[in-house]
Amino acid sequence: DKTGKTERRTADSDLGGTMRLGGQTCILKKNSNVFKMYKKNKIIERHRHRYEVNPEFRDGFNTKGMNIVGTSVDDMLVEMIEIKNHPWFLGCQFHPEFTSNPRDGHPIFNSFISSTIKTKK
């Protein structure tokens, strides 16, 4: 909590049950790098976490040079963020490694590797 006390689950508490687990739909902005990576505006990615971006910070991200480029279907949860005018920067709430394999790399990993190769040249 705000005082630093660790909350503990008890039989009569409602703590817990907040895990975002499994495939969740994410809507991508069309003018974003992630839209170019996936080549579509709606994706499903696997989650396993209890974390969310505080909605009070959304406007601050945009004014400080970050773009919210992926959100939940209801636009309540931030799923992906890019930095404006950066050749390749991406923050995401999901786990792209869950759906990547050696024969069929995840679009995020493929894009990152391609970008590093171009940058190195």
Segments and roles (model prediction):
Residues D1-K121:
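Amide-donor transfer/coupling interface in amidating biosynthetic enzymes
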